[in-house]
Amino acid sequence: MNRILLEVCVDDPDGLEAAVAGGADRVELCSALCAGGLTPSPGLMSAAGMPPVPVYAMIRPRAGDFVYDAADLEVMRRDIDAARAAGLAGVVLGASRADGRLDARMLTKLAGHAAGMGLTLHRAFDLVPDFAEALEIAVELGFERILTSGGAKTAPEAVEILEKLIAAASGRISIMPGSGITSNTAGTLLPRLAIAEVHSSCSTSEPANDMRLVEMGFAAPERRRTDAAKIRAMRACLDALAAKA
């Protein structure tokens, strides 16, 4: 098995530095990972244009569902412009209809606006009622990969579904498992899944250092911090699993 690419999601400058230091192959740049990841600020995008690994910006203007209107579309277009201006390698997109199916029209507009940049379809995919239909939409629109947990809370819970998605993709698009993947759980995915890349937060939970911030609504009781040591452990785990395959 070839070397498996490791994508790490981060939401602040320290996380970006840790991802590079730990050996991540690609970074998904966000804000508010506690809400599943939102669009990073232009300032953070600009800072991320310098690392020696490809960086993809999450384009998600708000928490909650992925059903977007014309005003959301305009915001996302401007966010894509900011990612391009910062020199980022790509963007992470997703949009749904009210019935949960992918919004092909909205995604066509977003993907078109991001022409020339790399494209990842985010976990709006995990909410669709028909994976086969959604996969074909992603292929048709030129997405490089689908980030997915197989519709489950975590990817290790949906290995059989991920196997089916990989078979259906048939090399036309990468299926990148994400959610709940750590150096302790990666062995449930590999070598069973013929994948080229995985997505992980490689983070550590830390309690808030000032409870006044929590009491006043400025911070959550705990936060996740990207951990370079966990990235190194994940990298070593993936390399060991690939060597055995």
Swiss-Prot record:
Cellular component GO terms, alphabetical: cytoplasm
Keyword Iron part of the UniProt annotation: no
Cytoplasm found in the keyword field: yes
Gene3D superfamilies: Copper homeostasis (CutC) domain
The entry's keywords: Cytoplasm
InterPro entries: CutC-like (IPR005627), CutC-like_dom_sf (IPR036822)
Location in the cell: Cytoplasm
Main location: cytoplasm
SUPFAM superfamilies for the chain: CutC-like (SSF110395)
GO MF annotations, alphabetized: copper ion binding
Family: Belongs to the CutC family.
Protein name per the record: PF03932 family protein CutC
Source organism: Sinorhizobium medicae (strain WSM419) (Ensifer medicae)
